[in-house]
Amino acid sequence: MHDAASGPPERTFTSHVYYGLTKSLCGVCKSAVDAKVQFVDDSVWFDKFCPSHGHQRVIVASSVEWYLDAMSFVAPMTPPRRVTTPVSAGCPFDCGACPSHQQKVFLPVIPITSACNLDCPICYTINKNNGAHQMSTEDLERILGHLVADHDEIDIVNFTGGEPTLHPRLPEFLEMCRAAGIRRLTISTNGLRLRDEAYVRKLAALDARIVLSLDTFRPETDRVLLGANTVKTKLDVLALLEKHDVATTILPAVAMGVNDDEVGALLELVLARPHIRSLELHTMTFTGQGGVGFQRTARITIPDLHRRIEAATGGRIDWRDFVPSPLAHPHCYSICYVLCLDGGGYVPFARLASRATLFELLGDSLYIEPREPLEQVFRDIIDDLWASPDRIPESARVLATIKRLLNDLFPSNRRLSILERQKISERAVKAVYIHSHMDEENFDVARVMKCPVGVPQENGGNIPTCSYNVLYREKDPRFADAGMLHRMTVTRPGARPEPV
């Protein structure tokens, strides 16, 4: 017992700084638990306790500086017009959208099939091939009807699966979306079906955009991530997409110690090919039929990828060239735009204008739109570089490139359509997105409540993608079956196999 006469007891200091509290999930049973946000050295961790499964910790960011900097970017949210479920169990168990959700959907992600021609160890969704689900035309009609009714404009729709190119009516679905007034039609694919040039030609005629999952250039790494060697096939597919001028995004899932050393090579590929519009890096997430059993040493965070990019580019791009998305929670996306200079080379947009300007240009869109605000920013950059030509080494080439772009995008003799401007601007200004998906271990209710990416339902509902993948897809018999759920149970770290 402490003797009061001897003074107060010596204080024992913790090895972390307590920053705040959020709501998360138990990594085993997925029950809601409190998560203390702790700064440990220069990293950010969630510290959780589940009454049934004990103490759990997970890293959520490898840089306190980035974590706090991202939170300094604040933008207003636009709640969804349609609420389909009441608040009952509390977020994230009432999706959706429920009255707690703070952001309308800007990117509807529509899984049109559960069929897939790969069984990837990194797959973070659930897909059954036996008795595979194929979305009907009627179901898509209902979904599109709700999307159009609930939004002033739907700029983009993404088709996913499974493997969406295995749906026999995918071209028809694209035509339906175009008829509904949707401008950007994207297909997330592993690319194997795109070996068929006639099929690529058909998609090109529909002005479809391809989001190609290219994770590595090494066959042995591809087997670790995808369970197959698809590298040559995907590079051949990229050549076909270039031949038919199909706008393409390269989407790698990045795992620490597996393929994170290839981020620079993937960025070089994107910058070198005119038809490749962007690079979207997804952090490895440990949920779904494959990801739940993947080694946890592969967890990587947004600041880790900033460092890989900075190292690969020799500092030509660093973390301060990125900003969060104004549409989402600041810790979900990190976005960098680069101006591709005439004659080769590039300069990050944030070095020509301020990060605040870049954040403002993104506004209420997933992308910088080539509209009048961008025209004014380009003119401001010209004025700034004329006044301070030594501010960046490439001043003369930047001036020449921006002047040409201004003439191409905003000619004095006629007004271009937004689609015409997009095609011009996307070849000159490329984007690097880092998207931090969540699993049951690093789940953050504060993030999911602001999610602008949703899985639309036939009844008009919309479920945020991370909630959908972690909590809801496994309950949907169109995508999940008992065998798949059992495999997920026994491959989870620390799990004990039980009979089906």
Predicted stretch roles:
Residues 1, 232, 243-426:
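Radical SAM enzyme [4Fe-4S]-AdoMet core and its adjacent flexible, acidic
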Residues 1-82, 339-500:
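Radical SAM enzyme core and accessory elements
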Residues 42-62, 66, 72-189, 193-198:
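Conserved alpha-helical substructure of the radical SAM core
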Residues 45, 107, 209, 249, ...:
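Broad gene-expression machinery/nucleic-acid interaction feature
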Residues 50, 89-98, 106, 116, ...:
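Functionally engaged cysteine thiol sites
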Residues 126-130, 217-220, 286-287:
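A short, flexible beta-alpha/helix-coil linker loop
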Residues 126-134, 223-230, 294-295:
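Short glycine-enriched, charge-decorated loop/helix-capping segments at active-site entrances
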Residues 141-158, 167-284:
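Radical SAM/AdoMet-radical enzyme domain recognition
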